[in-house]
Design a protein with these regions (language model features):
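Membrane-interface alpha-helices at helix entry/exit sites of multi-pass transporters
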Residues: 53-61, 92-101, 135-139, 143-150, ...
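Transmembrane helix-loop junctions in multi-pass membrane proteins
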Residues: 29-34, 79-84, 159-171, 193-207, ...
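Membrane-interface loop-to-helix entry segments
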Residues: 18-25, 29-42, 168-174, 180-242, ...
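Helix-loop-helix module between adjacent transmembrane segments
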Residues: 26-27, 102-127, 133-168, 172-197, ...
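Alpha-helical membrane segments and immediately flanking helix-loop junctions
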Residues: 53-89, 116-134, 138, 155, ...
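Flexible loop linkers connecting adjacent transmembrane helices
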Residues: 32-62, 86-96, 110-141, 326-342, ...
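N-terminal alpha-helical transmembrane segments of multi-pass membrane transport
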Residues: 1-74, 78, 89-95, 106, ...
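Extracellular/periplasmic helix-exit of transmembrane alpha-helices
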Residues: 112-125, 224-240, 248, 252-255, ...
Length: 441
């Protein structure tokens, strides 16, 4: 298929190098802030959660914890469960190592996106905060046409990777586990998404704040139950991750260097797909956070990548590896087998429910990205039309064959990243200067 071939070429080594290279540039210019100032960004984020003053001070529409939850809702989709299994199947256990390394590097991309998002944000015609990659492209660089192209791709991606593919994963999971008709799943999901998205960002953030922390905690606790039961296999799992990350040959043979190349490629790709650092999407929600400090919001971007990939994806990977579940096939089946090794039939049900809840969270999170992109292009009046189209796309995603949609949405994501990575590089000095000014780096 032509689109598939183009997609494979676009999402090849050059783009993954661009993601990593941009993260490295920002890391170097910030003095590797994400590593040298762990205590600082942890205190700024997790340490402030119990501080009412910190959470509610400054300009903005939603609290910083709500912004984090909403951004995590958008990126913590089904990929954090089945996508990790797919990465291991394609790149071996070593992919997990490179996934974490790419996330650590990508933390500074997320940080600087948020810094620039807050610095250049403004109120739109409805008085809502407008910010994100397309705003700093226009206001920071004067690249309005680039910003428009970014928004077109953002809208396409929101209907694809942020909508139909997530809905499809939920429908397939419910159909396989309970025999529920995809059409019924589609109607329920579409109604739920429409009810929340019509309430705007505050309703989206409120829902995300209730869903994400609770579901993430439950998933991690269930994962630890599997890990504890198989604790003797933990050293072996870590040994595999390290050894296969630097293996010169793939597990099934191949040319020298092929193993490490696959582990690198699929590990970095999984990290990018999971935390979205470098895509420029998450900064759209963070731009509405209540804060007067761009650098402070940048720290929340670091935490977001840490929780999404370093914690969530790594825990999923260790769970799969210690359980002995087959990781060379369908990702959802591998996860079901892993949790089933401890919880039996309930394990499969748990995976199904987790996929559905995380998919729903992604649906409501990405709806805001697409809506803001369309509003930037056509004005605030387009929001109502977008909400209707978005809900309809949820239903279509549940009942349709989405092979082409997957390919097109992946392509849109890749093309979104290009202008954003260019912008981050051009504004790298400005972003890191803001960070150093605030934290006396």
């Amino acid at each position: 298929m032509l689109v598939s071939s183009i997609n494979s070429a676009v999402w090849g080594v050059p783009l993954l190098v661009a993601f990593t290279g941009t993260g490295l540039l920002l890391s170097v210019r910030s003095g590797f802030f994400q590593i040298t100032h762990v205590g600082t960004w942890m205190k700024t984020t997790l340490g402030s959660i119990f501080s009412k003053k910190s959470r509610e001070s400054g300009k903005g529409s939603i609290s910083q914890t709500q912004a984090l939850s909403a951004a995590l809702a958008a990126c913590m989709g089904t990929g954090n469960i089945v996508g990790v299994a797919a990465a291991i199947a394609s790149g071996g256990a070593g992919a997990v190592f490179w996934m974490v390394i790419s996330a650590i590097i990508g933390m500074m991309s997320a940080c600087c996106e948020n810094i620039l998002g807050i610095k250049y944000r403004y109120r739109d015609e409805n008085g809502e905060w407008m910010g994100g990659a397309f705003v700093y492209m226009e206001r920071g660089l004067g690249f309005r046409q680039m910003a428009k192209i970014f928004c077109v791709l953002l809208v396409i991606a929101s209907l694809g990777i942020g909508n139909m593919t997530q809905a499809n994963a939920a429908a397939l999971s419910l159909s396989g586990s309970f025999g529920l008709s995809p059409a019924i799943t589609g109607l329920i999901l579409a109604a739920g998404v429409f009810a929340i998205t019509c309430g705007g960002l505050k309703r989206i953030a409120s829902a995300a704040e209730k869903i994400i922390p609770a579901m993430t905690a439950i998933f991690i606790l269930a994962s630890f139950a599997v890990i504890i039961k198989n604790f003797r296999a933990v050293p072996s799992a870590f040994s595999r991750i390290i050894s296969e990350a630097f293996s010169l040959r793939a597990a099934a043979g191949g040319a020298a260097g092929y193993g490490i190349k696959k582990a690198l490629r699929y590990g970095v790709a999984r990290g990018v797909f999971s935390n979205e650092a470098g895509l420029g999407s998450n900064a759209i929600i963070h731009a509405a956070a209540q804060t007067d400090s761009p650098a402070e919001q940048g720290c929340w971007g670091i935490l977001e990548v840490f929780l999404d990939t370093v914690v969530m994806c790594t825990v999923t990977a260790i769970t799969l590896l210690v359980s002995g579940a087959p990781t060379d096939g369908d990702g959802s089946l591998a996860c079901a087998a892993a949790f089933g090794s401890v919880f039996g039939k309930a394990g499969s049900i748990f995976v199904c429910v987790s996929i559905c809840i995380f998919a729903f969270a992604t649906l409501i999170g990405w709806s805001y990205y697409g809506r803001r992109g369309l509003e930037y292009l056509l004005g605030a009046k387009s929001a109502k039309i977008y909400n209707i189209i978005y809900a309809a796309a949820v239903f279509v995603g549940c009942v349709a064959d989405l092979e082409l949609v997957w390919e097109l949405s992946d392509l849109a994501n890749a093309l979104m990243a290009v202008p954003n990575l260019i912008s981050l590089c051009l504004l790298s000095g400005e972003a890191t200067k803001e960070l150093k000014k605030t934290y006396h780096n």
